[in-house]
C-alpha cells in the first residue's frame, strides 16, 4: 500500500510540474501575441542573437498564421526586381543556421501602424547588426508586416521586406522617431 501511495504521489507531483510548465509556456507565448507591439517585438527578438547562440525557432513559428509567408525584394543582375517567398519553416531552413553562426541583431527604429477591425499593417524600419554592440548597422530596410487578430491573439500573416540600397534610400518619414 505504501509503495502504491508513493508511486501515486510521485505521479501527481510530476504531472503537476508538467502542467505548470505547460501553462507557463502558454502564458509566455500569449505575451508575444497579445498586442501589435508585442508580436512585432517578439518577431525581432526571435531572430536576433549572438554568434553561436541558438534561436528559439518554436517561438518564431508560433507567431505565424497557417499559410503565412516571408518575402523579400532583390535586384537581379539585369536591373529588374524580383520577389523571393518563404514559409516560416522555409525561412528557418534557409537562414537559421547563418543567423546562429554569424550573429544577427535586427532592431526596429521606426514604426507606422495602420489598422482596421481585426487586421493591421505595420511599416517597420529596421537596422541589422552582427553584434549588439556594433555602432553602425550593416543593413537597413523596411519590413511590411500584415497581421490578423482572430479574437484571441495576433498572428503574422506576412512579412514583406526590402533592404535599403543606393537606388532606394529609406525616406526620412520612415526614419524619424
Q: What are these regions, as identified by a protein language model?
A:
Residues 1-11:
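Bacterial N-terminal signal peptides that target proteins for export
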Residues 14-22:
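C-terminal segment of classical bacterial N-terminal signal peptides
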Residues 23-62, 176-177:
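Short, low-complexity N-terminal intrinsically disordered segments enriched in polar/charged residues
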Residues 43, 60, 68, 122, ...:
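Hydrophobic pocket/interface hotspot
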Residues 51-79:
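N-terminal, post-signal-peptide region of Sec/Tat-exported proteins
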Residues 70, 74, 80-133:
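Surface-exposed, charged secondary-structure patches
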Residues 105-108, 137-144:
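Short, surface-exposed coil-to-beta transition loops
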Residues 140-169:
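Short beta-strand edge/turn micro-motifs at domain boundaries
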Amino acid at each position: 500500500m505504501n509503495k502504491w501511495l508513493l508511486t501515486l504521489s510521485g505521479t501527481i507531483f510530476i504531472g503537476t510540474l508538467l502542467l505548470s510548465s505547460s501553462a507557463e509556456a502558454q502564458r509566455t507565448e500569449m505575451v508575444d501575441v497579445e498586442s501589435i507591439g508585442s508580436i512585432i517585438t517578439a518577431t525581432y527578438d526571435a531572430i536576433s542573437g549572438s554568434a553561436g547562440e541558438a534561436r528559439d525557432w518554436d517561438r518564431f513559428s508560433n507567431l505565424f498564421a497557417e499559410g503565412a509567408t516571408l518575402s523579400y525584394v532583390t535586384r537581379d543582375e539585369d536591373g529588374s526586381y524580383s520577389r523571393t517567398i518563404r514559409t516560416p519553416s522555409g525561412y528557418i531552413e534557409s537562414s537559421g543556421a547563418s543567423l546562429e553562426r554569424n550573429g544577427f541583431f535586427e532592431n526596429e527604429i521606426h514604426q507606422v501602424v495602420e489598422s482596421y477591425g481585426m487586421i493591421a499593417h505595420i511599416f517597420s524600419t529596421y537596422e541589422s547588426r552582427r553584434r549588439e554592440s556594433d555602432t553602425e548597422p550593416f543593413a537597413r530596410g523596411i519590413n511590411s508586416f500584415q497581421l490578423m487578430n482572430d479574437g484571441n491573439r495576433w498572428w503574422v500573416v506576412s512579412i514583406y521586406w526590402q533592404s535599403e540600397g543606393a537606388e532606394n534610400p529609406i525616406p526620412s518619414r520612415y526614419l524619424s522617431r
